UniProtKB/Swiss-Prot annotation:
It comes from Rhodopseudomonas palustris (strain BisB5). Gene3D superfamilies: Hotdog Thioesterase. It catalyses: a (3R)-hydroxyacyl-[ACP] = a (2E)-enoyl-[ACP] + H2O. InterPro entries: FabA_FabZ, FabZ, HotDog_dom_sf. GO terms for cellular component: cytoplasm; membrane. It comes from the Bacteria. This is 3-hydroxyacyl-[acyl-carrier-protein] dehydratase FabZ.
Length: 151
């Protein structure tokens, strides 16, 4: 059984208040279904106008895998920050680790990537998440990411 939803939809304005990232490095458009088990889904609408497509690759644009991993990390950051309440609320998230990373299928302009993130561990200010990047119901990438929430 899934845990209850704490935040149903985190829009771009809330993300901008939560994360320090800005264009061209803010790589999520919204986060939905943040649950009490520290899971949630980040959403990235990939368009041909992405700056990375100027060089990756001009004649056959493919969304870079490293940017999907960063999108996973940003989604995890929003989940972590919004899940901590009161005076413990962190002001920054530092991306620390990437493990078990696999890229399975290219992501192209017009795709919507969903970053399905779930906490797999927490110790003090350290958090670990497993993430699956999903397009049209198919996993295109996966990784375990670690981060430190701090003030």
């Amino acid at each position: 059984m899934e845990s209850p939803i704490r935040f149903e939809n985190v829009d771009i304005n809330t993300i901008l208040k939560t994360l320090p990232h800005r264009f061209p490095f803010l790589l999520i458009d919204r986060v939905r279904n943040i649950r009490e088990d520290y899971s949630g889904i980040g959403v990235k609408n990939v368009t041909f106008n992405e700056p990375a497509f100027q060089g990756h690759f001009p004649d056959r644009p493919v969304f870079p895998g490293v940017l999907m991993i960063e999108g996973m990390a940003q989604t995890a950051g929003v989940i972590g920050i919004m899940s901590v309440s009161g005076t413990e609320k962190p002001r920054a998230v530092y991306f620390l680790t990437i493990d078990k990373c696999k890229f399975r299928k290219p992501v192209l302009p017009g795709d919507t990537v969903e970053y399905h993130m779930k906490s797999i561990g927490r110790r003090k200010t350290m958090w670990w998440f497993h993430g699956d990047a999903v397009v049209d119901g198919k996993t295109v990438a996966e990784a375990d990411v670690g981060a430190m929430l701090t003030d």
